[in-house]
Amino acid sequence: MVGVLEKRNKILSLMRHLTLEDGSFTVSQIAQQTGIPRTTAQDWVNRLIDEECIILESPGKGREPARYTARTALPQTLCKRIFSTCDGDWVEIYHECMSAGCAAFCRHHHKRSGGPLTDVRRDGTLLRERGRFGSVSADVGLSPLPAVGVVSIRQDGESIIHTIRSFGGPSYSLTEMMSRARGVLDVRTRRSGSIVEGDVYTKALSLVVIGLDDTDTPGDGATFALAYALLQRLGRSDWVMPIAHHVAMLWPGIQEKTAGNSCSLIEFAAEKDTVEDIIEDSVSFIAGESASQEWGIAIKVGLFRPPGSLAYGARARSERITIEDAQAFAEANGIRIAGGRGVIGALAAVSLHGCDEETLLNPNIPL
């Protein structure tokens, strides 16, 4: 068995080499370069086709032999989505990876490298990096240096360009994978010895945060489910990038609660000229799908919480807030609201935007 595996690996390695050098190969080439009979070479070709290691590029015709190409064992990309939102001179970059391990690796090294980034955190396979426009000189390489880091963030028209400096494995991601991610407009790389730098171009989008509450009744509906349905609905548009769906607990002493008194929050990035239409569509969708007439929606555009947001969120977690107070807070801070009593909790959801999961779910944690 070991001998068969060694032979297989040797033949497959040759096939990959010929594919890289010539674009394809024939059975005769494999037979000649390995010294095995042509019939044996054909058997190996058939076997490796069945294993999906190689594919038939063109069938034989007349005196022209069939030609084959080897498929790499490496995935085309682990970078699912890369996009960015902009608010003044602040930027948040989002990188959704198919591997939690790779996302953790990038978070660790990007955070160590610092640069223009002020905050680097991971939410599952989504890496969120916040920073300001600017550039720094940062070394990458073997430990104890970080292997990869963001060294520059700048804007050119409607594009955000963040420059990544990398060494080793991350260089492969930069040169071979990132350009395939949804949201990437272009990747321009350059190499200097063992260091690879790349400019990653994405569109400058707007961050939209929507809070929802009181969309259900004791016997029908669930606010968390309707919030997620809205995020899915918006995500089907080409101009929207879904980011997150969260649940936050509020003061349990509210008599009108349907259960434990929670509200929901969704985040997404959208093209700036579509935001107004998205807001109108979202309000219409919630109004039509809510089981309760007291539904409420609150919408904030931008990266940052308005002043006094955490104070409002803290009140909603510890006491009753009147609808008049909620309306005054929304008006003073440019937050759109619509609906009935639910705007109180919807505003609380927006006010708690940016808190970690444990804080969102435990009202006893001080803000």
Feature roles, as predicted:
Residues 1-15, 37:
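Short alpha-helical segments that sit at the start of domains
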Residues 6, 35-50:
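Short amphipathic alpha-helical interaction segments
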Residues 10-20, 207-209:
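Positively charged, polyanion-binding regions of nucleic-acid-associated proteins
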Residues 21-33:
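Short acidic, hydrophobic short linear motifs in intrinsically disordered regions
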Residues 29, 168-294:
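Long alpha-helical, hydrophobic tracts
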Residues 49-60:
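A short, conserved structural fragment
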Residues 60-71:
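Minor-groove-contacting beta-hairpin "wing" of winged helix-turn-helix DNA-binding domains
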Residues 78, 82-165, 173, 180-181, ...:
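Extended, charged/glycine-rich binding lobes that contact polyanionic ligands
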